[in-house]
Amino acid sequence: TSPLEKSTRYVVFEKGKYYRPAAIMNSKFADEYVQMCDELFVAYSSKVEPMKAFVREKWPIAAFDLGGKKFNEMTDEAELKRAKTAYESSVRARALDILRYYLPAATVTNIGITANGRAFEYLMMKLMSDELEEVRTIGQLMHQELSKVIPSLVKRAAPSSYISETKKTMRAFAAAKLSAVRIRKQPTVTLARYDKDAEINVVAAALYQFSHHPLSQLRKIVKKMTAEEKMKVVDEYMGKRTSRRERPLRAAETAYYQFDVLSDYGAYRDLQRHRVMTQIPQLLTVEHGYDVPPEI
């Protein structure tokens, strides 16, 4: 799948656009929930212009760099105009990046997804099997719409008892096993596990694509290479890229690293949208504390 989501960096979110779960709205916490979300949105929207002014003061346009040239070094009118437009865009983006900490996790957003029928089928199965009501509803609505255009490809999409039951039983098991264990403090980013043969794997895979040798033989050859020889292969394979948009070829994906990341929700959403990775998230919590940007 290829998803695209409304950005908290470039779009000011409207007041009142947050989810109201039936379980909360039918409980004694309904008024408190609505009041809290409304107050967060009021704080967010009321500070957009003041925060933009703060950003302009802290990062003035005179030091703004466009194409390697500072604003106060520019003389061409067209260049100055482009720089002013780019500067104001960066001011707005930085201000909204800071203020997104006010947005509750219940903030609703727009997501567009491009995928083939099989990917949609699996996605809907996961959505319709989720513990959250709003996620299940999205899965059902997606199924209704896709059934109009690719009915034969999504007709088997249905809730999975395996997914729902596994989540339920694993949550109960984890609670029983770990509830008495105190949560240990840790750094925000921890390299939990890494591939000790990463260099060998990448170099062997890089050579594999351009040879007819079996991988096992190439691994033995690479193990006998000097560090300089292996680095030469890596440089030839990846070193000619001119920008981050030119992704390395697939051999680079044969090395694996496992990180445990403790972050605020906004930072996680940025991470969630990018990179080739397998993500295993935990539920949102304040067990580890919370972040407040110094600018706020």
Where are these regions (language model features)?
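A conserved ligand/cofactor-binding region detector
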Residues: 1-296
